[in-house]
Amino acid sequence: MSEAAAQPPFEIRTVAVIGAGAAGRGFALACAGAGFHVVLEDVMPSNLRRAEADYADLTAHTAAGLLELALTVEDAVRAADVAVDFVPDELESKLEIFSMIDRMAPPKTILCTPSYTLSITDLASCVYRPERCVAVRGNLLHGGSAVPPTVRLLYPVAAAESTLAAVGWFLRALGIEVRRELDPDVPSLIKNTVL
C-alpha cells in the first residue's frame, strides 16, 4: 500500500474550521466534499448563512449531512480531530485562537494554521500540545485544477510523527500534495541537532 493510501495511526474524521470567510468557507466545503464531517465556526452569522447556501449546492451532489455550523469555538472543536483556523494572519489573533482551541478541544486534536508569515514554533510554544501543531503554507483550495497543489507542511521541533502522518494523509485526501519541512524559524543550532 502506498504512503498516500495508507491510513495514519491517528485517523482524521472530524474537522473544525475556525473562520467562515471566503477561504475558511471554501476549505470547509472541500473537506465536506471529500467526505469529512466538518464543523464550521464563525462569530458572524452572515458568514455562516453564506456557507449554508454554498453547502446546499454541494449537498445535491455528494456531501449531505457532513457540515455543521457553530457560533462558538468551543462548539466547533468539541469532537474535532483537527482544527484549522482561518483567522487573520496576525500574531495576536493566531495566539488567541490557538489558546482557545488548546483549552477547549480534546487532547487528541491537532492544531493547524495556514499561516504565511508566522512561525509555527512560536505558536506551538504557547500551547500545552506543541507536538500536535503544524502550519501549512500554500494553496489549500485548488478548485478542481488538473495539477494538484503542493503545500509546505511546517512543523516545530516538538511535532510528533503521528501528527505529521495524520495531517499529510488528510491533505492528500483533499487532493493536495504535501512537502514536510521543519519550521524555517527554528534556530540553526537546534535544526542541526534535530536533523
Locate each region found by the language model.
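Helical "substrate-binding/catalytic lid" subdomain
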Residues: 173-174, 182-195
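Short amphipathic alpha-helical segments
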Residues: 28-30, 52-53, 95-98, 123-125
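Rossmann-fold dinucleotide-binding core
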Residues: 110-181
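NAD(P)+-binding Rossmann beta1-loop-alpha1 motif at the extreme N-terminus of oxidoreductases
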Residues: 2-61
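Structural motif
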Residues: 18, 41, 70, 86, ...
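Short glycine/serine/threonine-rich phosphate/pyrophosphate-binding segments
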Residues: 24-26, 92-95, 118-120
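Rossmann-like NAD(P)-binding element
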Residues: 43-46, 50, 60-110
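Structured loop/turn residues at beta-strand edges in well-structured enzyme cores
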Residues: 10, 77-78, 128-131
